[in-house]
């Protein structure tokens, strides 16, 4: 892949081995003493990484984990802010997902970290404090958005496409303004999550579906350009093992003139094919459309 077209990333998931979930409501037994075994894990270092390599990690659940009693320690056994530990060990980007309203009518969180904008601001401030940039991942849903489900947020449920685009634009703009006002260093904004032919309740299988999906994407991009003009804009898909699908996504983004900088892809090796295929698929996108590509 062309050197000047690739954003080089390693995506990680921050996990706590003493937890079965990351919702604050799942932490009833956190104060009970647990037996933990210790062992050595060795990962061979990748040599000669370029200076612009993005070493990223999704840390969206950290506040919920900490509320459940989780603490973090460095290699010397000293308790520290986990974001300081990450920064000291080469992480330079923190990815945080944002759900519109991850709570039921009684104010109970859906779980998964209850990742609303306030959670993102808290994470962003701490990441920025330790010299890391934030990748803001808007799902435009009240809970997980993925290829199997792209549900419209409750507040937007009965909106037509024009009204929904305006709501998405305003929500994106207001959320980014909150991050900006808090002094967060936003380096990239992801418009949607794993938007494989669907986003925010719109489906490509419906007549005019891609036109509506890309209209929503452009509404989000407009807000980013206005509030965070220096941030990169990413559009995100999954299942790179389906090369024809990725080619189709690229064509639709180009045809409908979506304003974006980075074509981003999930990559789970168990499901998503070989690294060779991933490289070929993303290289084709970069070469065809002149976009940066990224795995996150």
Where are these regions (language model features)?
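Acidic (Asp/Glu)-rich catalytic clusters
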Residues: 46-51, 81-90, 122-130, 178-184, ...
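Structural preference for beta-strand elements that scaffold enzyme active sites
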Residues: 52-56, 92-95, 133-135, 185-190, ...
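Active-site cleft segment of glycoside hydrolase catalytic domains centered on the general acid/base Glu
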Residues: 109-110, 115-121, 145-251, 258-260, ...
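Active-site clefts of carbohydrate-active enzymes
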Residues: 200-201, 235, 265-268, 288-296
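N-terminal substrate-binding region of glycoside hydrolase catalytic domains
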Residues: 33-122, 126-128, 133, 141-167, ...
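C-terminal motif of bacterial Sec signal peptides marking the signal peptidase cleavage site
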Residues: 20-21
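Bacterial N-terminal signal peptides that target proteins for export
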Residues: 1-10
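Active-site beta-loop-alpha junctions enriched in small/polar residues
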Residues: 60-62, 99-101, 139-143, 191-196, ...
């Amino acid at each position: 892949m062309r050197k000047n077209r690739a954003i080089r990333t390693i995506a990680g998931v921050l996990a706590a081995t003493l937890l079965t979930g990351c919702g604050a409501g799942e932490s009833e037994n956190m104060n009970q003493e647990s037996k933990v075994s210790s062992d050595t894990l060795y990962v061979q270092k990748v040599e000669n990484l370029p200076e612009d390599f993005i070493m990223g990690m999704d840390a969206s659940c950290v506040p919920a984990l900490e509320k459940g009693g989780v603490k973090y320690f460095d290699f010397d056994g000293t308790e520290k802010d986990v974001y300081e530990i990450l920064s000291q060990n080469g992480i330079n980007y923190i990815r945080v997902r944002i759900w519109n309203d991850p709570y039921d009518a009684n104010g109970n969180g859906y779980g998964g970290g209850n990742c609303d904008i306030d959670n993102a601001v808290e994470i962003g401030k701490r990441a920025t404090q330790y010299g890391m940039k934030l990748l803001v991942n808007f799902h435009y849903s009240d809970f997980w958005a993925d290829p199997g489900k792209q549900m419209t947020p409750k507040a937007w449920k009965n909106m037509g496409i024009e009204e929904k685009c305006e709501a998405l634009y305003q929500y994106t703009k207001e959320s980014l303004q909150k991050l900006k006002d808090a002094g967060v260093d936003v380096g990239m904004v992801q418009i949607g999550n794993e938007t494989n032919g669907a986003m925010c309740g719109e489906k490509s299988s419906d007549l005019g579906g891609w036109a509506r999906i890309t209209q929503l994407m452009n509404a989000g991009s407009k807000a980013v350009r206005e509030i965070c003009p220096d941030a990169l804009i990413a559009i995100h898909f999954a299942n790179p093992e389906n090369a024809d699908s990725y080619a189709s996504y690229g064509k639709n983004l180009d045809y409908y003139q979506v304003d974006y900088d980075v074509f981003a892809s999930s990559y789970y090796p168990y499901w998503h094919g070989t690294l060779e295929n991933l490289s070929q698929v993303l290289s084709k996108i970069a070469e065809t459309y002149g976009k940066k590509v990224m795995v996150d």
